[in-house]
Amino acid sequence: MKIFYKAINMTLSMFTVIPLPKYEWDDRAAKHIMKLYPFIGLIIGALWYLSFFVLSKLNVPIMLMAALILTVPYILTGFLHLDGFMDVSDALLSRRDKETKLRILKDSTVGAFSVISVVLLLLVEFAGMFTVLNKNLDMRILIFIPIASRVINGYFIVSQEMLGQSSLAKFFKEGTGKVDEIILLGIYVLVALITFFTLGINYLIAILAMGLISFILLLKVKKELGGINGDVAGYILVLMEFTGILLLGII
């Protein structure tokens, strides 16, 4: 139980900005982090929905509400995944050879492609959120989107080849195996079923589309970079959640 509690603490500390007591890194607890990654999604999703609930009760104008709600998951994660999205976008859009792309990925300099990509992402995502709010959809979907994105992300991290000596390989992949993959896939199926029975078919389509786009992105990244790392995981996660919001605005 102590190890499990420490694993929760470690997971929250690594993937959110939620203040927690200081802890010492424990390799035994680290192997449980990916199984707990969906729990991070649940917390972020609950706070995401809570932000909508509070803002709607305050009668905040829809356009402003859309902008504020959109920032919540990014703020809660310390812009961790958005940073990865920018880095990978810079590498992939460079249209260089594999070695150059990997060098760009490691470069801390903010490139033009990363800036263009994040501006377009946030602009379209804002339009999607604004449309979703205008359509008076069931905003409980905000709870499920971050869970689904992190389930799939966790599955990729434990099942796919890592780029070089990625820190993810050392801290998260070691000590995991087929059982972890099955658990994460099982959670994704459970999330899809709960979404369908509580919200309906259109919301299920959004969750399934997130899964589909994630595998398409994974194939693209593996082809161009050769594997995944923390930045790639963030890139895929951001675009999964973007897909979920955008699709809800369309269907």
From Swiss-Prot:
GO cellular component: plasma membrane
Family matches, as InterPro entries: CobS
Catalyzed chemical reaction(s): alpha-ribazole + adenosylcob(III)inamide-GDP = adenosylcob(III)alamin + GMP + H(+); alpha-ribazole 5'-phosphate + adenosylcob(III)inamide-GDP = adenosylcob(III)alamin 5'-phosphate + GMP + H(+)
Gene Ontology terms: biological process: cobalamin biosynthetic process
GO terms of molecular function: adenosylcobinamide-GDP ribazoletransferase activity; cobalamin 5'-phosphate synthase activity
Disulfide bond sites: none
Keywords annotated in UniProt: Cell membrane, Cobalamin biosynthesis, Magnesium, Membrane, Transferase, Transmembrane, Transmembrane helix
The UniProt record lists the keyword RNA-binding: no
Biological role: Joins adenosylcobinamide-GDP and alpha-ribazole to generate adenosylcobalamin (Ado-cobalamin). Also synthesizes adenosylcobalamin 5'-phosphate from adenosylcobinamide-GDP and alpha-ribazole 5'-phosphate.
Full protein name: Adenosylcobinamide-GDP ribazoletransferase
Organism: Clostridium perfringens (strain ATCC 13124 / DSM 756 / JCM 1290 / NCIMB 6125 / NCTC 8237 / Type A)
Phylogenetic placement of the source organism: Bacteria, Bacillati, Bacillota, Clostridia, Eubacteriales
Chain's gene name: cobS
